[in-house]
Amino acid sequence: MSKKITDVVNIATSAAEIERYPTPEDRLVKGNPEQNNTLHFSTDDRFFVGEWGAEVGCWKVSYTENEYFHVLSGKSILRDTEGNELIVVAGDKICVPAGFEGEWEVIEPTQKIYAIYEN
């Protein structure tokens, strides 16, 4: 079936609602950061586009999905299980492969736009 212009999503003007939630206790490393997510687009349970943000803190991550993200603001550290770090700041464009495990540490409140493909 052919899609129409009404199926196109402009993220800047999307009416999607912001979901705010605490970081799950079993993943916390330090702090108690609130996270937020706005899902702008998903046609199935495999591909998602949205905006995400978090306050200062650190938690464990385990990616089952491939993710591309563009940092809009803030500063965070993505750390693998061996302690290797990648500092991400506004303007960075990052791809994280499914299977990545480690920690996400927010140094300054961070906001990103993302596209996720769940394997």
Language-model segments: which ranges?
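Short acidic-glycine-tyrosine-enriched beta hairpin
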Residues: E82-A98
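Ligand-binding loop in jelly-roll beta-barrel domains
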Residues: A98-N119
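Short hydrophobic/aromatic-rich beta-strand segments that constitute the beta-sheet cores
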Residues: V61, L78, K112-Y114
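Short, surface-exposed charged micro-motifs
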Residues: L39, Y68, E103
